[in-house]
Amino acid sequence: MPFIYINILLAFFISFIGLLMYRSHLMSSLLCLEGMMLSLYILGTLLCLNMHFTLSAMIPMILLVFAACEAAVGLALLVMVSNTYGLDHVQNLNLLQC
């Protein structure tokens, strides 16, 4: 296994561990999710280029679109929670029920 794949997988797992450890604030959770999506995008792109998968070349772009949608929804939720409660704690998300 090439060294770059190990680095990208290590970046994914570090972001995942960060998501598990720093889950009290919504902003840190969103940053860890973005790190995970970025490492998955790079890994998918490298695999498509190195394995010559011409039919699946659109999969990394689709993943990037979903990452952008996830970031937009996460930031909108962060703005709504911080305007309503003044904090960005994840525990305030349970209070947003109708």
Curated annotation (Swiss-Prot):
GO cellular component: mitochondrial inner membrane; respiratory chain complex I
Subcellular location: Mitochondrion inner membrane
A single MF term (Gene Ontology): NADH dehydrogenase (ubiquinone) activity
Entry superkingdom: Eukaryota
Ranges in coiled-coil conformation: none
Disulphide-bonded residues: none
Key words, A-Z: Electron transport, Membrane, Mitochondrion, Mitochondrion inner membrane, NAD, Respiratory chain, Translocase, Transmembrane, Transmembrane helix, Transport, Ubiquinone
Pfam family name, one: Oxidored_q2
Catalytic activity: a ubiquinone + NADH + 5 H(+)(in) = a ubiquinol + NAD(+) + 4 H(+)(out)
Residue ranges of the TM segments: 1-21, 29-49, 61-81
Enzyme class of the recorded protein, top EC level: translocase
Main location: mitochondrion
Membrane topology: Multi-pass membrane protein
EC number(s) from the headed UniProt entry: 7.1.1.2
An individual GO BP term: ATP synthesis coupled electron transport
Subunit-structure text: Core subunit of respiratory chain NADH dehydrogenase (Complex I) which is composed of 45 different subunits.
The family this protein is said to belong to: Belongs to the complex I subunit 4L family.
Function: Core subunit of the mitochondrial membrane respiratory chain NADH dehydrogenase (Complex I) which catalyzes electron transfer from NADH through the respiratory chain, using ubiquinone as an electron acceptor. Part of the enzyme membrane arm which is embedded in the lipid bilayer and involved in proton translocation.
Protein name: NADH-ubiquinone oxidoreductase chain 4L
